[in-house]
Swiss-Prot record:
Keywords: ATP-binding, Cell shape, Cell wall biogenesis/degradation, Cytoplasm, Ligase, Magnesium, Manganese, Metal-binding, Nucleotide-binding, Peptidoglycan synthesis. It catalyses: 2 D-alanine + ATP = D-alanyl-D-alanine + ADP + phosphate + H(+). This is D-alanine--D-alanine ligase A. PROSITE patterns: ATP_GRASP, DALA_DALA_LIGASE_1, DALA_DALA_LIGASE_2. It comes from Mesorhizobium japonicum (strain LMG 29417 / CECT 9101 / MAFF 303099) (Mesorhizobium loti (strain MAFF 303099)).
Length: 357
């Protein structure tokens, strides 16, 4: 009888998206095929401690997969090919894992940090590599690379702590309203819509509370369209039909609350009601954006569709959400690839990439 592949599922983490990660992990833990995989849940506390969880007990409450304060602390052994070192009283050590599946969002999980740790540990891991993870996480860097690849993006100005620039200069360059957002955060954390000079200072201060660099970006009057990209072990890409996010008017834009905590915060429509030529262009542009950033395995590519039919790439998310309302799995389901199959493909990709190195 073939042994099951041991999959360490990482969730929680130090970032502001800790709770989002828990919601995503609950779905992955529910969807993964336990006849094929031995699941090794590892909950990461807000202070960054990794704690091994019994597979049968890492279920979900209303807030997602549990991150208890107890549990055996573990770490990946550098060069250990998946060996876990545990801090236990009796000295017993857990079995090695075959692949690490980071279900982590934001800094310390989506930005190349965990990917680099897995590389040092010489263990297979799901998702993009170090460079693509870091580049996509930094909205400023990602925009530069996408623009260099010939893809249209929204106009923006990058500001740093201590070097913000004046409202007059930025409004003159981008027009009003515009958005201020942390350069390296997700889930709309720290994002503000600026309508006038009075709101500018507070918006920048909020963005820089989450990062040392902020992006000031023009307001784009358009529909929010998203495509899921899934790469198989042979390098071939599947790009889903586009889906659409329709935020409720009361939120003004697709806020963190609208995404995760307001059942009526937005409508997720898959597939999007768009003309065939828009479907074709989003598919082609999503694949180009994926390759431009050097992505591997998976990404969600977000667009703005303007009234004249033009498309702008908004961002590339290398560890998209797996929550109940998240677009990534929903859009792939519309392409005929179910949740469990997506997980299979991602794990197969991770193992094949590691074998090839």
């Amino acid at each position: 009888m073939k042994e099951k592949t041991r999959v360490a599922i990482l969730y929680g983490g130090r970032s502001a998206e800790h709770d989002v990660s828990r919601l995503s992990a609950a779905n992955v833990l529910k969807a993964i095929d336990r006849t094929r995989y031995e699941v090794v849940p590892i909950a990461i506390s807000r202070d960054g401690r990794w704690r091994l969880q019994p597979s049968s007990e890492a279920g979900a409450d209303g807030a997602g997969a549990q991150v208890p304060e107890d549990g055996v602390e573990v770490a990946l052994l550098p060069g250990g090919k998946g060996r876990l070192v545990a801090l236990t009283k009796n000295g017993e050590q857990p079995d090695p894992v075959d692949v690490v599946f980071p279900v982590l969002h934001g800094p310390f999980g989506e930005d190349g940090s965990v990917q680099g740790y897995a590389e040092v540990a010489d263990v297979a891991y799901v998702g993009c590599g170090i460079l693509a993870s870091a580049a996509a996480m930094d909205k400023d860097v990602a925009k530069r690379l996408l623009r260099e690849a010939g893809l249209a993006v929204a106009r923006s100005v990058t500001v740093l702590k201590g070097d913000v620039g004046s409202f007059q200069e930025i409004a003159g360059a981008l027009g009003l309203p515009f958005f201020a957002k942390p350069a390296r955060q997700g889930s709309s954390f720290g994002v503000s819509k600026v309508h006038d000079r009075d709101g500018f200072e507070q918006a920048v201060e909020t963005a820089l509370r989450y990062d040392s660099k902020a992006l000031i970006e023009e307001f784009v009057d358009g529909r929010e369209i998203e495509c899921s990209v899934l790469e198989r072990a042979d390098g071939s890409l599947t790009v889903s039909p586009p889906g659409e996010i329709i935020p409720a008017d009361k939120h003004g834009f697709y806020t963190y609350e609208a995404k995760y905590f307001d059942a009526e915060g937005a409508v997720v429509k898959v597939p999007a009601d768009v003309p065939a030529d828009v479907v074709a262009r989003t598919s082609e542009m999503a694949a180009r954006a994926f390759r431009a950033l050097g992505c591997e395995a998976m990404a969600r590519v977000d667009f703005f569709l303007r009234a004249d039919g033009s498309l702008l790439v908004n961002e590339v998310n290398t560890l998209p959400g797996f929550t109940d309302i998240s677009m990534y799995a929903k859009a792939l389901a519309a392409a005929g690839i179910g949740y469990s199959k997506v997980i299979d493909v991602l794990i197969e990709h991770a193992l094949a990439r590691h074998r090839a190195r």
